[in-house]
A protein has these predicted regions:
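Hydrophobic alpha-helical transmembrane segments of ABC transporter permease domains
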Residues: 91, 103, 107, 115, ...
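ABC-type nucleotide-binding domain
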Residues: 352-353, 359-604
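Transmembrane helices of ABC transporter permease
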Residues: 44-57, 68, 96, 163-217, ...
Length: 604
């Protein structure tokens, strides 16, 4: 029952230029990074490859043994067939093929284990990376795109490792081994098979060079498609409210069409390879049969050599199909690896491990000293913000949309680095405090009520352990939730789900109760009553007054009636403080705050 926030930015799915795709920035580099990521599994992978190579050697021995059987049978047609010799060869073949089957099973099992561990490692890396990325990254990247990297791209990499790594090695070995065996058997027939098969290589390389850009585009459009679906699903009510179903459907159709186009092109290119390799293989097979028949009639080779060559041609051409499929999978893996490692290598927040540990005792004195900030150098939001907040004061920050209210809170929480000036808590600059410590100092109640699937107890005690029912009762009484919760069959253990229809006000009260349980020394209340009715607003306001008592609090609100009792009101406009004082003082001035306040009552 979580409420997912929509990402800031443009319209969902509007990802920029309508380009069907482009080549990977660094195809070899992406594969190189993936190979280095698999370094802990090198020994196991080598064992799997060696097992696969042993299986290939066994398959290469088979045609030679079958050739011997054929020659023994052919020679016996004029007299007596040497059955003991044939039985001996057959037993040898059975043993070899059983060993080959066991090696194949072992290779598949080992690569499955390696693949799962690599996938888990990549997902763990992405999960840990998320906690080290700045807030600005998530404001410029859709949630669906990040999810696509965690799921689709990692799965693509895993499938390539499992299905293509060993097959690529075995295909190369089989190709080289079959060439050696054919040349050692009869060079004329070997050249016939090789020349007739080489036609496929040029075509395969040409297709590969043209298809890579479509595989890259497919992964990118898949990320956009996931992002669009995730946003429209979570914001479905808003879409219906504004009658934007047709507009969103058109956006979905556009992205889905691009996805279909690039997917069709990539699969079309991929689909060309297998029929092409099949044709080349059959053509080589026919050529070998014709040339072999001529040589046999001339007495140059025996009939057993023709039989062996028929099998060697299959062994020679089948790696071409495997190489084609492996090349296709590698292109998909390269595109996926590029996106995954692009995320893993994204710029992180600065390392703060060198900062000294801070004391837990906090008075709550906050000073803003000529703070300056801009999301970009040419877009300054906060020009010169200075203010001193005493311990325990309740400070309200008001102003029109875009004035910089939420930006100041983000700077106070160290979500963004300052562009200039300094913020101090109890005389200690934020630059000398770790982000984790700053976050521990503040409890937050936001307009967007974030509740996750789980019990009411889990949501109220989020991040806290050892909270008793008595403590929960005390907090829920203070927030007006006690009666609601105790009328539920499971009480605090009731699971939040779609069946439990909590109102917006009840959800807001739960977030206030959660902040009470957190018991942080300072508070940030961001427009916590702007989406509820007047009666619920009064309940929330009472709970907030209880919550802020004795704590340094920063309140951002559009409803100015909720901050009358604030110790200080800061009026912001265009990133600067234009007025400061109590509610009564600001009304007496008759300035911008008075205009805002009076306009709200005129509208009411």
């Amino acid at each position: 029952m979580s409420e997912t926030k929509r990402r800031p930015g443009g319209h969902p799915g509007m990802r920029g230029p309508d380009v069907p795709g482009e080549k990977a920035k660094d195809f070899r580099g992406s594969l190189g990074k993936l190979i280095r990521h698999c370094k802990p599994f090198y020994p196991v992978i080598c064992i799997a490859i060696l097992g696969d190579l042993a299986g290939v050697i066994i398959r290469l021995i088979g045609p030679n043994k079958i050739s011997e059987i054929t020659n023994l049978i052919t020679a016996g047609l004029r007299g007596e067939i040497d059955m003991p010799a044939i039985q001996k060869i057959c037993i040898t073949l059975i043993i070899l093929y059983v060993v080959g089957a066991l090696l194949s099973f072992m290779t598949g099992l080992v690569m499955t284990v390696v693949t799962q561990k690599v996938n888990r490692g990549l997902r763990d890396g992405i999960s840990h990376k998320i906690n080290r990325l700045p807030v600005s990254y998530f404001q410029s990247t859709s949630t669906g795109d990040v999810l696509s990297r965690v799921t689709n791209d990692v799965d693509t990499i895993g499938q390539t490792l499992q299905n293509s790594l060993t097959s690529l090695v075995s295909a190369v070995t089989m190709f080289i081994g079959s060439v050696v065996m054919m040349l050692s058997t009869n060079w004329i027939m070997a050249l016939t098979a090789i020349v007739s098969s080489m036609l496929g290589f040029g075509l395969m390389l040409g297709i590969m060079s043209r298809s890579q850009k479509y595989f890259v585009a497919r992964q990118r459009w898949l990320g956009d498609l996931n992002g669009h679906i995730e946003e429209i699903y979570t914001g479905h009510n808003v879409v219906r409210l504004f009658g934007a179903e047709q507009r969103e459907q058109q956006a979905f159709d556009r992205i889905n069409g691009k996805m279909q186009e690039t997917d069709w092109k990539s699969q079309f290119m991929s689909g060309l390879m297998m029929p092409l390799m099949g044709f080349i293989g059959n053509f080589a097979y026919v050529a070998v049969c014709v040339v072999g028949a001529v040589l046999a009639m001339n007495g140059t080779i025996s009939f057993g050599v023709i039989v062996a060559f028929m099998m060697y041609v299959r062994l020679f051409t089948s790696p071409l199909s495997q190489l084609a499929q492996a090349a296709t999978n590698l292109q998909s893996a390269a595109a996926a690896a590029e996106r995954v490692f692009e995320f893993l290598e994204a710029k992180e927040m600065p390392d703060e491990s060198h900062l000294p540990a801070q004391t837990k005792t906090v008075r709550g004195e906050v000073a803003f000293d000529h703070v300056r900030f801009g999301y970009t150098p040419d877009k300054i939001i906060i020009h010169d913000f200075s203010e001193h907040v005493q311990p325990g004061q309740k400070v309200a920050i008001v102003g029109p949309t875009g004035a910089g209210k939420t930006t100041m809170v983000n700077l106070l929480m160290k979500f963004y680095p300052l562009g200039g000036g300094e913020i101090r808590i109890d005389g200690v600059p934020l630059s000398q405090m770790t982000r984790e410590h700053v976050h521990d100092l503040f409890g937050m109640v936001l307009q967007d009520t974030w509740l996750f699937e789980g019990s009411i107890r889990d949501n109220l005690c989020y991040g806290k352990e050892g909270i008793t029912d008595e403590q929960l009762d005390q907090v829920t009484r203070a927030t007006g939730l006690y009666h609601l919760i105790h009328t539920l069959p499971e009480g605090y253990d009731t699971l939040l789900s779609d069946k439990l229809n909590l109102s917006a006000g009840q959800k807001q009260l739960m977030t206030i109760a959660r902040a009470m349980i957190e018991n942080a020394p300072m508070l940030i209340l961001d427009e916590a009553t702007s989406s509820v009715d007047t009666r619920t607003e009064m309940l929330i306001q009472q709970a907030m007054d209880t919550l802020t008592k004795g704590r340094t609090s920063f309140v951002i609100a559009h409803r100015l009636s909720t901050i009358k009792n604030a110790d200080k009101i800061l009026v912001m406009r265009h990133g600067d403080i234009i007025e400061s004082g109590t509610h009564e003082e600001l009304l007496q001035k008759g300035g911008f705050y008075a205009e805002l306040y009076n306009s709200q009552f005129e509208q009411a």
